[in-house]
Amino acid sequence: MQLKSYPAPTYAQRAKIAFQYMMPQLYLTQAAGWLAERKWGVITHFIINVFAKKYQVNLAEAEKTKASDYASFNEFFIRPLKENARPINQNPQALCLPADGRVSELGKIEENQLLQAKGHQFSLETLLANDLNLADKFKNGNFITTYLSPRDYHRVHMPCDATLRKMIYVPGELFSVNPFLAEHVPNLFARNERLICEFETAFGPMVQILVGATITASMSTVWAGVINPPRAKEVAVYEYLPTGETAVHLKKGQEMGAFRLGSTVINLFPKGAVELEAHLKAGEPTKMGERLGKINL
């Protein structure tokens, strides 16, 4: 993968980058999580209204359409949408986009290297917590990274029918993951806290990764509930059987997890398994349920 050269950041941009390294990421995130859970009545409703106006949140598509319907900011932030607000592409060979947001990057995994943003790449091994067997499954495959901004719907859904086989919690940094920082913080997604979910599908293995960030107070899944806090200090691996009472089977378009405040989702596909939609480019807005690509069966 050949990378182009880009202009050096300005002094103002360098200061912004330096602040990310110096600020107390964990304490800010813990404080944001505590505040987001407060139930302060009219104060909470005022904050939600200000936030919705600033970020142009479309509450009309949510099940609860008024700020006063939400007891806490977190309840507002992970608001469910009305039924059919996000139609799921029903073509059996179609993959669906997992989240609302914007494409950060996408394309081919060059041997074991993914493009983070212009001028930066990172390896499968570091992203996947040095699980070499897992990384080998996706060499020369495809990937897509979706950035969820504060205005977006923050539940994450399945691109296809799948069975959960492994979940890996990886402790890490809590850098912001906005497009500017993605361009200037090396190995951003491979150094941030993240939750790696490996699934078995009709076309082979698939990975969906929830990446934490500054003030992303918690991540959750539909099968295990809230993963953090508390934040473990070591990598934790959970294996799942494909059959039996504890098996986790999810349908295309079904919810699989959520962020309490925004972050990023990364999907990995094996070599030759899928073709990503040609119109999808970095910066392209995404809506959950729309077509991500075609399964090669």
UniProtKB/Swiss-Prot annotation:
It catalyses: a 1,2-diacyl-sn-glycero-3-phospho-L-serine + H(+) = a 1,2-diacyl-sn-glycero-3-phosphoethanolamine + CO2. GO terms for cellular component: plasma membrane. Keywords: Cell membrane, Decarboxylase, Lipid biosynthesis, Lipid metabolism, Lyase, Membrane, Phospholipid biosynthesis, Phospholipid metabolism, Pyruvate, Zymogen. Its EC number is 4.1.1.65. Is synthesized initially as an inactive proenzyme. Formation of the active enzyme involves a self-maturation process in which the active site pyruvoyl group is generated from an internal serine residue via an autocatalytic post-translational modification. Two non-identical subunits are generated from the proenzyme in this reaction, and the pyruvate is formed at the N-terminus of the alpha chain, which is derived from the carboxyl end of the proenzyme. Binds 1 pyruvoyl group covalently per subunit. Its cofactor is pyruvate. It holds the Pfam family PS_Dcarbxylase. It is found in: Cell membrane. The record marks 262-263 as: Cleavage (non-hydrolytic). The modification Pyruvic acid (Ser) is found at residue 263. One of its GO terms (biological process) is phosphatidylethanolamine biosynthetic process. The active site is at 100 (charge relay system), 157 (charge relay system), 263 (charge relay system), 263 (schiff-base intermediate with substrate). It is a peripheral membrane protein. GO terms for molecular function: phosphatidylserine decarboxylase activity. Its main location: membrane. Pathway: Phospholipid metabolism; phosphatidylethanolamine biosynthesis; phosphatidylethanolamine from CDP-diacylglycerol: step 2/2. Heterodimer of a large membrane-associated beta subunit and a small pyruvoyl-containing alpha subunit. Catalyzes the formation of phosphatidylethanolamine (PtdEtn) from phosphatidylserine (PtdSer). Belongs to the phosphatidylserine decarboxylase family. PSD-B subfamily. Prokaryotic type I sub-subfamily. This is Phosphatidylserine decarboxylase proenzyme.
